[in-house]
């Protein structure tokens, strides 16, 4: 299991054990993390699982695909460290990953 810390816009933290092979979004949804709406269910089609990856983890989460880049155009307050959490596959290498959630997904 990889421990992932989800930090809400207000600073509240939730640390979740996520099984390798799942996505950061799936870990959030399975554990009722507020702020990850995941309207499309993880199909990279809605941008409602937008997160900010902690700078220390950017290299370990992999590159954004062209599709993810396109979908981020629909997210609010996009930053250079913005990712769609449905596109970050959890592995043991991501144990300790920290992501911050935007104020709103819509």
From Swiss-Prot:
Cofactor(s) it depends on: [2Fe-2S] cluster
Annotated ranges, domain 2Fe-2S ferredoxin-type: 1-105
Note on how the cofactor is bound: Binds 1 [2Fe-2S] cluster.
GO CC, alphabetical: cytosol
Highest taxon of source: Bacteria
Keywords per UniProt: 2Fe-2S, Electron transport, Iron, Iron-sulfur, Metal-binding, Transport
One GO MF term attached to the UniProt entry: 2 iron, 2 sulfur cluster binding
Binding annotation for [2Fe-2S] cluster: 40, 46, 49, 86
One Pfam family cited in the UniProt record for this chain: Fer2
Keyword Magnesium: no
UniProt cross-references to InterPro entries, sorted A to Z: 2Fe-2S_ferredoxin-like_sf, 2Fe-2S_ferredoxin-type, Adrenodoxin-like, Adrenodoxin_Fe-S_BS, Beta-grasp_dom_sf
Biological processes, Gene Ontology terms: P450-containing electron transport chain
PANTHER family assigned: FERREDOXIN-2, MITOCHONDRIAL, FERREDOXIN/ADRENODOXIN
Similarity-based family: Belongs to the adrenodoxin/putidaredoxin family.
Full protein name: 2Fe-2S ferredoxin
Lineage per the UniProt record: Bacteria, Pseudomonadati, Pseudomonadota, Alphaproteobacteria, Caulobacterales
Gene, per the UniProt record: fdxB
């Amino acid at each position: 299991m990889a421990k992932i810390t989800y930090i809400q816009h207000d600073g509240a933290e939730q640390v979740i054990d996520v099984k390798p092979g799942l996505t950061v979004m799936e870990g959030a949804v399975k554990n009722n993390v507020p702020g990850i709406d995941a309207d499309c269910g993880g199909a990279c089609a809605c941008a409602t699982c937008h997160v900010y990856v902690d700078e220390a983890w950017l290299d370990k989460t992999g590159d954004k695909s062209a599709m993810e880049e396109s979908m981020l155009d629909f997210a609010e307050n996009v930053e250079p460290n913005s990712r769609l959490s449905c596109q970050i596959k959890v592995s043991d290498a991501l144990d300790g990953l920290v992501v911050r959630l935007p104020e709103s997904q819509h």
